[in-house]
């Protein structure tokens, strides 16, 4: 079995082949995300602790977290699931994946060093691969250089060198995101002012509408009362005329 071991602190990665079954027994029956002591791999691995991050079987099917089995299963996968990348919007597909429990049928096991041991491992812990790009977000730049809120972040941006033959060497800096500048504060003040204006305008319009509605309702009520009074007058008039006619007879 091959072991693909990575060390995030240095950015290095190393693939080693282990033929001795006894060295691999410590990883068998362990699940993904389990931390295991790597002492069994050899003398130089003494004190190292590794985390099982995944693996592939001999046919190339990947291990999937949460599938509690040794073997292979066919799952209906959609966007957001591991081991699947949708080609079309809303596409789902039934794919073969391997369970998250390690056994002897794996061809590659991925491990991440969580704790460094006593000795250095050549090509893994003794060399450092520099990061290609620095942080872009203002808060992350502050965190990296331990800056306070008063310090100017723009002076601490990690610049990328662009060296071309026959041209002047120059550097390129990323645009800092979430940087608080006077312009940003001005935009914020403007947004708040506009919101206040809208609220005030809505309140005034609502009060005006309520006033108009009350006026219309009052007018309708008066009209209704007039109609009722008119009907009453007419009915009383009819009653009086009918009485006078009956008395004459």
UniProtKB/Swiss-Prot annotation:
Ranges in coiled-coil conformation: none
UniProt modification remark: Ribosomal protein S6 is the major substrate of protein kinases in eukaryote ribosomes. The phosphorylation is stimulated by growth factors, tumor promoting agents, and mitogens. It is dephosphorylated at growth arrest. Phosphorylated at Ser-235 and Ser-236 by RPS6KA1 and RPS6KA3; phosphorylation at these sites facilitates the assembly of the pre-initiation complex. Mono-ADP-ribosylation at Glu-35 by PARP16 inhibits polysome assembly and mRNA loading, thereby inhibiting protein translation.
Region Disordered, residue ranges: 217-249
Residue positions, PTM N6-acetyllysine: 211
Low complexity compositional bias, start-end: 236-249
Effect of residue 137 to X: Abolishes hydroxylation by KDM8
GO biological process: cellular response to ethanol; cytoplasmic translation; glucose homeostasis; negative regulation of bicellular tight junction assembly; positive regulation of apoptotic process; positive regulation of cell population proliferation; response to insulin; ribosomal small subunit assembly
InterPro entries xref list: Ribosomal_eS6 (IPR001377), Ribosomal_eS6-like (IPR014401), Ribosomal_eS6_CS (IPR018282)
UniProt modified residues of type ADP-ribosyl glutamic acid: 35
Pfam families, per the entry: Ribosomal_S6e
Positions bearing (3R)-3-hydroxyarginine: 137
Residue numbers of Phosphoserine PTMs: 148, 235-236, 240, 242, 244, 247
Keyword flag Ubl conjugation: yes
Primary subcellular site in the record, as a coarse category: cytoplasm
Cross-link (Glycyl lysine isopeptide (Lys-Gly) (interchain with G-Cter in SUMO2)) at residue(s): 14
GO molecular function (one): protein kinase binding
Keywords: Acetylation, ADP-ribosylation, Cytoplasm, Hydroxylation, Isopeptide bond, Nucleus, Phosphoprotein, Ribonucleoprotein, Ribosomal protein, Ubl conjugation
Compositional bias ranges of the Basic and acidic residues kind: 217-229
Summary of the function given for this chain in its UniProt record: Component of the 40S small ribosomal subunit. Plays an important role in controlling cell growth and proliferation through the selective translation of particular classes of mRNA. Part of the small subunit (SSU) processome, first precursor of the small eukaryotic ribosomal subunit.
Record note on quaternary structure: Component of the small ribosomal subunit. Part of the small subunit (SSU) processome, composed of more than 70 proteins and the RNA chaperone small nucleolar RNA (snoRNA) U3.
Protein name: Small ribosomal subunit protein eS6
Species whose genome carries this gene: Homo sapiens (Human)
